[in-house]
Every structure is written in C-alpha cells, then in structure tokens.
C-alpha cells in the first residue's frame, strides 16, 4: 500500500547545498520552516528554483519536517 502524503503550497526562503531548500508553508497554522528537496522530475527538466519562488511540496504524514518539492508555481508578475 502506498504511503499517503499531504500536498501544500509554500515559499522558498533559503537555498541550502545539494538541492535542499527551506520552505515556509502557507496553509499551516504554525509558521515552521520545513526542509524540502527537489524531485527527480524537476531535476531532469533543469528547472531552476530560487529563494522567493512559490512551490508545491509533498509532505509525509509520518515526518512533517521534510518534504519533496514537486512543482514550481509560475510568478504572477513575470512575462514568460
């Protein structure tokens, strides 16, 4: 049976070595930062993730301190 995961939206606050990022979740009551790593699909597609980007992150129900970044949301003010 596949593990159930929560999907949240968040903001990248800090870039760490080895493709890790600190992410502040939007729809969670506590303002904790969680550790996010880049999924393989994003890595293969050469999608750049920078501090200030909005992302979708998949968080395990068992360990809510880390998650996998699965999607980078488009910026509303960019022209591309």
UniProtKB/Swiss-Prot annotation:
Q: Does the keyword DNA damage apply?
A: no
GO MF annotations in UniProt? ribosome binding; rRNA binding; translation initiation factor activity
Instruction: Print the keywords alphabetically.
Output: Chloroplast, Initiation factor, Plastid, Protein biosynthesis, RNA-binding, rRNA-binding
Q: Where does the S1-like domain lie?
A: 1-74
What is the purpose of this protein?
One of the essential components for the initiation of protein synthesis. Stabilizes the binding of IF-2 and IF-3 on the 30S subunit to which N-formylmethionyl-tRNA(fMet) subsequently binds. Helps modulate mRNA selection, yielding the 30S pre-initiation complex (PIC). Upon addition of the 50S ribosomal subunit IF-1, IF-2 and IF-3 are released leaving the mature 70S translation initiation complex.
Its quaternary organisation is: Component of the 30S ribosomal translation pre-initiation complex which assembles on the 30S ribosome in the order IF-2 and IF-3, IF-1 and N-formylmethionyl-tRNA(fMet); mRNA recruitment can occur at any time during PIC assembly.
User: Which NCBIfam families does the record cross-reference, listed alphabetically?
Assistant: infA
Name of this chain's protein: Translation initiation factor IF-1, chloroplastic
**What species does this protein belong to?**
Illicium oligandrum (Star anise)
